[in-house]
């Protein structure tokens, strides 16, 4: 899965086995990470869930979670060190910076692993590689950067220690469907998760067996969350709505209709306004939303809030030539929106002005796109966007035929009684 995000002052691009760190102003690459082709075997690990399942089962006994007895690991084949020819391909799945910008967490697909790097100005130092039982769906660091949460596509959430890297992962909580996004509050007392079954769950930490509240109201998958304050979050969903919640009370505070289902959410806090009587209490946030299959590919919204009163003050749509290429992700900076996608199944990028939604061409250095794409030659540059249609609920009508047969049977019985 191709990924891109902005972590001031860097634009981070992840695709295939490479992660690029780019200056968002002149688009010069100043650092890169390339994952080994045989990631797990090169670190003496097995590419399977066998060893990981044993670790996670032991961790669950002390981690506030449980493991279903008799559950067989999904992956049973192992790959010994040196058998790299038969190893699954490695590709970047999720990338996240720690709040102190000292650590970078990467989860991979193919050979499923959590890779931890210590970041330096000119290079990144590998800290640990830990095998995952299942493909990850989201990752999130603790506010103090001491641990990282990893959710997988079966709905489980594990905590991995970033200091004691040999420590076993701890199973914290589980959903009955895939978790699309996860938040961890600044005081580390609540973990907030959203899933395919329309739910936003607020779980107490560290006693994760205790659910604090639910934020209910969405009618489709909840694809993105953003933490607005110590008590407020916003969410976007496939039901074409943006909502603001008081997550501690489980109360909906604002609902705004969107032009299309939302599949990605990026958030940036804005400086407070200097004028006005309530300027000190007024919070301002910018939200970037990627839409599913819509002429307006990306929507930009500004939120203002004072206490439990929130409103959308500004909105801007960016068409990004939607329909001419497959858009899979984007990054939101102060003045620009960098859009990532595939054209003719090859990776490409485009840049737009966040204030008016127009393409930026004259302000970008010549050859910037070629310079970035040259880092992904040959098969490394191939890009097949994820089929997001599977995110939507499939509804099957298995009652209408039964009711029709029942109706005919009753009518026949009534006719027989008349005769």
From Swiss-Prot:
Chain intervals with Low complexity compositional bias: 51-61
Annotated stretches, region: Disordered: 51-75
Nucleus is among the record's keywords: yes
Pathway: tRNA modification; N(7)-methylguanine-tRNA biosynthesis
A GO CC term assigned to this protein in UniProt: tRNA methyltransferase complex
Subunit structure: Forms a heterodimer with the catalytic subunit Mettl1. Interacts with mei-P26 and weakly interacts with bgcn; required for the function or formation of the mei-P26-bgcn-bam-sxl complex. Interacts with nanos; may be involved in mei-P26-dependent derepression of the BMP signaling pathway. Interacts with Myc; the interaction may be mediated by mei-P26 and may be involved in the regulation of ribosome biogenesis.
Keywords from the UniProt entry: Cytoplasm, Developmental protein, Differentiation, Nucleus, Oogenesis, Repeat, Spermatogenesis, tRNA processing, WD repeat
Protein name in the entry: tRNA (guanine-N(7)-)-methyltransferase non-catalytic subunit wuho
WD repeats (start-end): 87-127, 174-213, 217-255
Organism: Drosophila willistoni (Fruit fly)
Record-linked InterPro entries: Trm82, WD40/YVTN_repeat-like_dom_sf, WD40_repeat_CS, WD40_rpt
């Amino acid at each position: 899965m191709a990924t891109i995000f902005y972590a001031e002052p860097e634009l981070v691009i992840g695709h295939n086995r490479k992660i690029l760190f780019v200056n968002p102003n002149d688009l010069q690459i100043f650092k890169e990470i390339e994952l080994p082709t045989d990631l797990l075997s090169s670190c003496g690990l097995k590419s399977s869930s066998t060893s990981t399942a044993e670790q996670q089962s032991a961790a669950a006994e002390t981690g506030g979670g449980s493991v279903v007895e008799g559950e067989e690991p999904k992956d049973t084949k192992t790959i010994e060190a040196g058998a790299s020819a038969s190893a699954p391909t490695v590709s970047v799945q999720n990338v996240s910076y720690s709040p102190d910008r000292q650590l970078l967490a990467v989860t991979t697909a193919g050979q499923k692993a959590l890779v931890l790097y210590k970041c330096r100005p000119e290079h990144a130092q590998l800290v640990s590689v830990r095998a995952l039982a299942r493909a990850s769906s989201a990752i999130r660091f603790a506010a103090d950067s001491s641990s990282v949460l990893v959710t997988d596509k079966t709905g489980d959430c594990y905590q991995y220690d970033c200091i004691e890297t040999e420590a076993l992962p701890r199973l914290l909580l589980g959903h009955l469907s895939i978790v699309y996004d996860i938040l961890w509050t600044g005081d580390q007392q609540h973990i907030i998760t959203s899933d395919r079954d329309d739910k936003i769950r607020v779980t107490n930490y560290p006693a994760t067996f205790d659910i604090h509240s639910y934020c209910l109201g969405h009618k489709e998958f909840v694809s993105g969350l953003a933490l607005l304050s110590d008590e407020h979050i916003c969410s976007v969903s496939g039901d074409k709505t943006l909502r603001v919640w008081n997550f501690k009370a489980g109360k909906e505070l604002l609902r705004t209709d969107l032009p299309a289902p939302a599949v990605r959410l990026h958030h940036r806090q804005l400086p407070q306004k200097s004028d006005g009587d309530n300027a000190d209490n007024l919070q301002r946030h910018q939200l970037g939303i990627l839409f599913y299959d819509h002429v307006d590919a990306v929507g930009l919204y500004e939120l203002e809030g004072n206490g439990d009163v929130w409103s959308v003050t500004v909105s801007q749509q960016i068409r990004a030539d939607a329909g001419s290429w497959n858009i899979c992700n984007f990054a939101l900076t102060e003045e620009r929106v960098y859009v990532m996608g595939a054209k003719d199944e090859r990776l490409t990028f485009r840049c737009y002005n966040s204030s008016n939604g127009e393409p930026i061409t004259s302000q970008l250095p010549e050859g910037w796109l070629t310079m970035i794409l040259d880092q992904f030659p040959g098969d490394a540059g191939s890009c097949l966007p994820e089929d997001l249609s599977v995110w939507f609920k499939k509804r099957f009508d298995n009652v209408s035929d039964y009711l029709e047969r029942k109706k005919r049977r009753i009518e026949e019985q009534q006719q027989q009684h008349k005769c």
